[in-house]
Curated annotation (Swiss-Prot):
Catalytic activity: uridine(2552) in 23S rRNA + S-adenosyl-L-methionine = 2'-O-methyluridine(2552) in 23S rRNA + S-adenosyl-L-homocysteine + H(+)
One GO location term (cellular component): cytoplasm
EC number: 2.1.1.166
Subcellular location per the Swiss-Prot or TrEMBL entry: Cytoplasm
Family: Belongs to the class I-like SAM-binding methyltransferase superfamily. RNA methyltransferase RlmE family.
InterPro entries: RNA_methyltr_RlmE (IPR050082), RNA_MeTrfase_FtsJ_dom (IPR002877), rRNA-MeTfrase_E (IPR015507), SAM-dependent_MTases_sf (IPR029063)
Residues noted as binding S-adenosyl-L-methionine in the record, renumbered to the chain: G48, F50, D67, D85, D107
Biological role: Specifically methylates the uridine in position 2552 of 23S rRNA at the 2'-O position of the ribose in the fully assembled 50S ribosomal subunit.
UniProt KW keywords: Cytoplasm, Methyltransferase, rRNA processing, S-adenosyl-L-methionine, Transferase
This protein's encoding gene: rlmE
Origin species: Borreliella burgdorferi (strain ZS7)
Top EC category: transferase
Full protein name: Ribosomal RNA large subunit methyltransferase E
Active site feature: K147 (proton acceptor)
Length: 192
C-alpha cells in the first residue's frame, strides 16, 4: 500500500516494489553486505518487498518466504512460499526442509494496538521467536536481520545477538518513518 505523499512510497511504486520498506533493506545491505551464497529465509514476508529484493540478490540458493498472509510474488525458480505461523510446528518443519540458510531477514511486526507497552511486548516476543528459530537454521557464519520495536526489552534482544554473532549492530535506516519506534538488529557471522 502506497501513501503517495511519501518519497519512499513514490519511489517503490515507480521501481515496482510492493512496499516502501524495501529501502530499509537496501540501505542496510549496501552498508553491511548481508547476502552471500546460500539459501535466504524471509520471515514475515508480506507484502513482499523484502523478498523481491532478496530474490534479486540471491546467489546460488533458494529464497524461502514465510508469512501468515499470502504475498503477491511468484517466481519460477529458486523460490518457495510457506503460508504459516512461525510459532507452529508444521511451519517450522517446512522451514527446516530448506536449511541451512546463509541469511535470515525479518521485517515482521505484530498487529499493533496503539498501546506502546503492549506493542513493544508483542514485538519482543516475536523477535525472540525469530532469533530462536534462526539459531536452529542458520549456517555457521550466517547473518540475521530483525526488526524490533524500541521502548521495551530490546536490550535483551541485543544481548542475545551479542552472544551468538561476531558482529552486532543496531540500525535505524533513513526510510524508517520519523514517528516510528522501529529499529533493526543485525548479527553477522553466526557462531562466533
Amino acid at each position: 500500500m502506497y501513501r503517495l505523499d511519501d518519497e519512499y512510497s513514490k519511489k517503490a511504486k515507480r521501481e515496482g516494489y510492493l512496499a516502501r520498506s524495501v529501502y530499509k533493506l537496501i540501505e542496510i545491505n549496501e552498508k553491511f553486505s548481508l547476502f552471500s551464497s546460500g539459501n535466504v529465509l524471509d520471515i514475515g514476508a508480506s507484502p513482499g518487498s523484502f523478498s523481491q529484493y532478496a530474490y534479486k540478490k540471491l546467489k546460488r540458493g533458494i529464497l524461502v518466504s514465510v508469512d501468515i498472509n499470502d504475498i503477491g510474488l511468484r517466481y519460477d525458480d529458486n523460490f518457495y512460499f510457506i503460508k504459516g505461523d512461525i510459532f507452529l510446528d508444521d511451519t517450522v518443519f517446512k522451514i527446516n526442509t530448506f536449511k541451512p540458510y546463509s541469511l535470515v531477514i525479518s521485517d515482521v511486526a505484530p498487529k499493533t494496538t496503539g498501546n506502546r507497552l503492549v506493542d513493544t511486548s508483542n514485538s519482543f516476543n516475536l523477535s525472540m521467536r525469530i532469533i530462536d528459530l534462526s539459531l536452529e537454521v542458520l549456517l555457521k557464519k550466517g547473518n540475521l536481520l530483525v526488526k524490533v520495536f524500541q521502548g521495551g526489552d530490546e536490550m535483551q534482544i541485543f544481548k542475545k545477538f551479542e552472544k551468538y554473532f561476531k558482529f552486532v549492530k543496531k540500525i535505524r535506516p533513513k526510510a524508517v518513518r520519523k514517528n516510528s519506534f522501529e529499529i533493526y538488529f543485525l548479527g553477522k557471522s553466526f557462531g562466533k
